[in-house]
UniProtKB/Swiss-Prot annotation:
It is a multi-pass membrane protein. Signal peptide: none annotated. The keyword Transmembrane helix applies. It comes from Lactiplantibacillus plantarum (strain ATCC BAA-793 / NCIMB 8826 / WCFS1) (Lactobacillus plantarum). This is UPF0316 protein lp_1140. Keywords: Cell membrane, Membrane, Transmembrane, Transmembrane helix.
Amino acid sequence: MHIDMGMLVLIFIINFAYITLNTVRFLLVMRGYRYFAAFASVIEITIYVLGLSLVLNRLNNPINLVVYALGYGVGVYVGMVIEDRLALGYTMISVILPDPKSSLPGVLRENGFGVTQHAAYGLEGERLELEILAPRKNERRLYGLIKDAAPNAFVIAYEPRYISGGFWLKRVKRRNARRKKQ
């Protein structure tokens, strides 16, 4: 059995590129970026057909299949890393604070975050509950502010499907007005 290293590298790179693009495209679809996702899918399927044909035409060498699978696994990982760095969309953070007089809402507002707060009651008494909508690109900074100001906070994050009105609508309108003046 002859091992063609150039072919193995090519198979790995093609499947790595295909799956990386596939992962990013899937996440674009989930976040509603239809046009980018459609464009990515055209490139993705072209790469897929190339890679699959290379492997299917060389099934006599099982190492080709192993390298194809390795490219797949690495592609999924890298695709997720890319999506994490792009940080598309928004995150909704719910924070429950044991101290109803916590300074955290003020700290978050001073740092540009919109915060809705209301009184809550838990097993051990009164609590303060915060709801914060933030772009995912600011998520790590937000978590850092929460951890610094309220290390005992209970934090839950989830991805909103639909956003309308409120703090974000006002902010977007102000930003658009500033751009028109420039």
